[in-house]
């Protein structure tokens, strides 16, 4: 990605102080990248405060509250970012829907809810990004999706989540081939279990012994990997599912 090219990043799912999306916004802003983030079910006062925090880093920042389960969300988001900041050269699909279900509880409603956010929204954001990128004067771009290690082992009790996240890996690999001629790299990151807003003390105590490095991953760990993939140095990396989870031991 050319250093003379103004960089604008679109990040979905930055909805609370301690989540991965928020850490990604901070990391990219610290590198001089303008930020557009989406959120949902967030405290309005916190969103405004966080936006001001990013602005104090010397970059532009816009936020948008949107329900990604809406079939028109991808188009709406790209229209808004183009109007407010310009064409993004970086897309990070961080938002996800997750609800526990097993063979007893899984139903059409749960499948549809997971599909709408984890697959449809993600995929449409990617292709809308690429279509607009092709019409722009941007030289190279980055798409970074998020997976959950479903390639490395089973996730019992998370059937819809595991299936829809697994689809992201397949989509990432295929899309990378299509977009390579445009100068867009497409990768996915599995950050492993991350000590963010979802993790309770019970879960934390259960997972801690499974990390040989002596600690659970943090949102900043994920943000550093994503920032690297969004950088100029990662221009030769595409079609990869990167497991950045501190040697996490499954089973």
Curated annotation (Swiss-Prot):
InterPro entries: NAD(P)-bd_dom_sf, Sc_DH/Rdtase_CS, SDR_fam. PROSITE patterns: ADH_SHORT. It is an enzyme of class 1 (oxidoreductase). It comes from the Bacteria. NADP(+) binds at residues 12-21. The active site is at 161 (proton acceptor). One of its GO terms (molecular function) is oxidoreductase activity, acting on CH-OH group of donors. Its EC number is 1.-.-.-. Substrate binds at residue 148. Keywords: Oxidoreductase. Pfam families: adh_short_C2 (PF13561). Belongs to the short-chain dehydrogenases/reductases (SDR) family. NCBIfam families: PRK12748.1. PANTHER family: NADPH-DEPENDENT ALDEHYDE REDUCTASE-LIKE PROTEIN, CHLOROPLASTIC-RELATED, RE15974P. This is Uncharacterized oxidoreductase YjdA.
């Amino acid at each position: 990605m050319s250093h003379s090219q103004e960089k604008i990043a679109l990040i979905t799912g930055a909805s609370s102080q301690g989540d991965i999306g928020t850490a990604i916004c901070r990391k990219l802003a610290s590198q001089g990248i303008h930020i557009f983030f989406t959120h949902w079910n967030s405290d309005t006062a916190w969103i405004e405060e966080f936006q001001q925090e990013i602005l104090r880093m010397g970059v532009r920042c816009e936020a948008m509250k949107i329900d990604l389960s809406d079939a028109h969300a991808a188009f709406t988001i790209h229209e808004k970012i183009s109007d407010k900041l310009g064409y993004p050269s970086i897309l990070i699909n961080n938002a996800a829907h997750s609800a526990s279900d097993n063979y007893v509880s899984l139903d059409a409603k749960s499948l549809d809810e997971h599909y709408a956010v984890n697959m449809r929204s993600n995929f449409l954001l990617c292709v809308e990004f690429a279509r607009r990128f092709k019409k722009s004067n941007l030289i190279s771009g980055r798409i970074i999706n998020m997976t959950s290690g479903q390639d490395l082992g089973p996730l019992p009790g998370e059937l819809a989540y595991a299936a829809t996240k697994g689809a992201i890996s397949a989509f990432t690999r295929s899309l990378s081939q299509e977009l390579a001629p445009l100068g867009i790299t497409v990768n996915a990151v599995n950050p492993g279990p991350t000590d963010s807003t979802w993790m309770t003390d019970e879960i934390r105590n259960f997972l801690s012994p499974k990390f040989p490095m002596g600690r659970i991953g943090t949102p900043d760990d994920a943000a550093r990997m994503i920032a690297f993939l969004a950088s100029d140095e990662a221009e030769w990396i595409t079609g990869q599912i990167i497991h950045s989870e501190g040697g996490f031991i499954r089973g």
